[in-house]
Curated annotation (Swiss-Prot):
Organism domain of life: Eukaryota
Binding residues annotated for Zn(2+), in chain numbering: H26, D28, E141
Binding sites annotated in the UniProt record for substrate: H168, R242, D301
Molecular function in Gene Ontology: metal ion binding; metallodipeptidase activity
Enzyme nomenclature, EC number: 3.4.13.19
Induction comment: Expression is co-regulated with the other genes from the sirodesmin cluster and corresponds with sirodesmin production.
Species the sequence originates in: Leptosphaeria maculans (Blackleg fungus)
Protein name: Dipeptidase sirJ
Pathway(s) annotated for this protein in UniProt: Mycotoxin biosynthesis
Gene Ontology terms describing biological process: proteolysis
Family assignment from sequence similarity: Belongs to the metallo-dependent hydrolases superfamily. Peptidase M19 family.
Necessary cofactors: Zn(2+)
Gene name of the record: sirJ
Length: 394
């Protein structure tokens, strides 16, 4: 395995990225704007200024020849999740903050229309790329963000969200996390199985990064649509709990899904301080040789970590990774799939499943809501409308 891509490979990488959009599966720029700039997007110029905080700004994205990215509208798990308590009312602040983050991303897209364009479909990604814009897709990072409500999931979809990670660092009402102290559902809960069906119906991509092995297995046995791991790596290269084991990767192949390799040093090697671009390449090659390059992508997690692996310092450095893949003799047709072709295919397949379910008249997942009227008032209403009461009895 070569140590540094030369100019020839960088030129070939640039040429490839002029033909095919590089789509990053997970980017936390919105989180750092919330943390450092308190969501005030007019205090700095994110398209022109130098030396801005973090791994991401528009100049870096352009230098990195980025064709599209999933912006994460991430909000942390509430404290109750840490003790496996999932009360509905405790998620109200989580839902509010998620809406704030979705709004932030949409405002950034509106503020920088020469560079960013909202994409909600696979064809929309290609359209944005052809128009010279960075296709901007939205994801949420954990179903704690929907507050135990499929109605909220649907509203997020209507706002443009196209993938939902099932868990973050803690369990929730739907599924177990890879990093929780103990499981509570042994994979998916009953509600979790219902929400998987709803996500298939809706056309929401299921993201299994952060989930436990049993959760991933349960989902892969149930889902009718391909899934993704938006920012994970291979357990067979480095045995970290956030990485994906071979048995799950083989199921992923059967599912026609996608694992998008992360740049997080702790996921990349046993020595995070020395984790490098070459370790990311090792993970990509490992998965490609195990299950095929049709199932590998890139999910950096930029701005979701203090420091990325050496050699991939920020979004401007993506061409170095692409050049290294070419230098390691991965056929350019496969590299095109890795950088974005696979994600576009998966998204199109998810859309097709949703379309078929619509044709089959699969109904949306309804939920129990807090009672508005008591039985006595319902009886008064029923007495006022005897015809309706008679129809209800049929």
């Amino acid at each position: 395995m070569k140590s540094e891509p030369g100019n020839e490979f960088l030129e070939r990488a640039a040429n490839l990225l002029s033909r095919v959009p590089l789509i990053d599966g997970h980017n936390d720029w919105a989180n750092i704007i919330r943390g450092y700039y308190s969501n005030k997007i007019h205090v700095r110029n994110f398209s022109r200024e130098e030396s801005l905080v973090g791994h991401v700004d528009i100049k870096k994205l352009r230098k990195g020849l980025v064709g599209g990215t999933f912006w994460s509208a991430y909000v942390d798990c509430p404290a109750q999740d840490k003790i496996n308590v999932f009360n509905d009312d405790s998620y109200l602040e989580t839902i509010r903050e998620t809406l704030q983050q979705i709004d932030l991303i949409l405002r950034l897209i509106k503020k920088y229309p020469d560079d960013l364009e909202l994409a909600t479909t696979s064809s929309g990604i290609l359209s944005s790329f052809q128009n010279g814009k960075i296709a901007s897709l939205l994801g949420i990072e954990g179903l704690h963000q929907i507050g135990n409500s499929p109605s909220v999931l649907r509203m997020f979809y209507n706002l443009g969200v196209r993938y939902a990670t099932l868990t973050h660092n803690h369990n929730n009402a739907y599924a177990d996390s890879a990093t929780a102290k103990t499981p509570v559902h042994n994979g998916l809960s009953i509600k979790g199985r219902a929400i998987i069906q709803e996500m298939n119906r809706l056309g929401m991509i299921i993201d299994l990064s952060h989930t436990s092995e049993q959760t991933a297995e349960d989902v892969l046995r149930q889902t009718r649509a391909p899934i993704i791991f938006s920012h994970s790596s291979a357990f067979g290269v480095h045995p970290h709990p956030r990485n994906v084991k071979d048995n799950i990767l083989h199921m992923l192949k059967s599912n026609k899904g996608l694992i998008m390799i992360s740049f997080v040093p702790e996921f990349s090697s046993a020595d995070p301080g020395l984790s490098s671009l070459m370790d990311v390449v090792k993970h990509i090659i490992y998965v490609g040789e195990l299950i095929g390059y049709d199932h590998v992508g890139i999910g950096s997690d930029f701005d979701g970590m203090a420091r990325a692996v050496l050699g991939l310092s920020d979004t401007s450095t993506f061409p170095r990774l692409v050049a290294e893949l070419i230098a390691n003799q991965i056929p350019e047709g496969d590299v095109e799939k890795i950088v974005g072709g696979n994600l576009i295919r998966v998204m199109g397949d998810v859309e097709a499943v949703a379309h078929r379910q619509c044709e089959d008249d699969i109904l949306e997942l309804e939920e129990e809501v807090k009672p508005l009227w008591d039985d006595a008032f319902k009886a008064k209403i029923a007495a006022a409308y005897p015809e309706a009461l008679a129809l209800n009895a049929l």
